[in-house]
Amino acid sequence: GFRLASCECRLPNGLMLPLSILNQARRALVEQIQTVRQEREAPVPSRLSAAFTPSALPAGAAAPDAPPHLSVLCRRPEQIPSVLDAGADAVYLDFEDLRDYAAGVKAVRQHADSIPVFLATPRIQKPSETGYFKLMERAEPDGILIRNLGAAQYFRHSPLRRIGDFSLNVANPYSAAILKERGRLEYLTLSYDLNAEQVADLLRATPPEWFELTLHQHMPMFHMEHCVFCTFLSDGTSYKNCGRPCERHHVQLRDRVGQLHPLLADAGCRNTLFNGRAQTGAGFLRGFRRLGLSRFRLELLDDPRSEER
């Protein structure tokens, strides 16, 4: 219960109040106090119920002589042959139309049956869009590139291999350990928010074999629900009546210094704006190899055939 320590009232002279009004004020005050106390004492929902400390390996303990493994992400079917000819160890497919995944998987296996092929999920997944996952399963890939927690939950018990992508934002040993264990992921892509020094710190604190590093790519700068293609290149209002201009037009946005940045749509009609200038971390390769990292990735955008090689 509660005990009133003091009370100060400032009322006009001659005012008469029934006792019921005072009781109402007392009850309202008690309810407000109880609400505040419950909010202060309630446990934080995101707090782990027990201490969770990932195991760590000292520098150089994670098989530094392991051969490097190179995976390549393709965004167009015609990129597949040159990527396989160049000697990729694994292929990730990230197509706008998920219905093309089955043909992409077939193309990889016809060209190089021993090369594993992974299919990328959308960055964002709404509850009504689990049909995308079923479509990916029917393509019969070797594995899935997990880009959101809904995909991690859906494929958690799948026999397919599961790789965590950059959008899971693995930036410290705790997030890496939780996602790898709870999501049953084979390995994780390091967050794009980390600089080279921070990547090195994470590799020293966590088993390097947990990770893959995107070494060369056009950095995704914005991912948005708004569809530029539908808004400016059609008279429609959604995928039902826009006529799919994203399948016919190549769109780039020009920034204030004249640089062109490619814009791509995904299966959910969400748009991603990519940096028109490729970013590479090749200069840090030897240092990361010395720290035990062996998995690296190259991501293609609309690269010409000569650059793909």
Q: What kind of region is each of these model predictions?
A:
Residues G1-E307:
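Active-site pocket-lining/capping segments in soluble small-molecule metabolic enzymes
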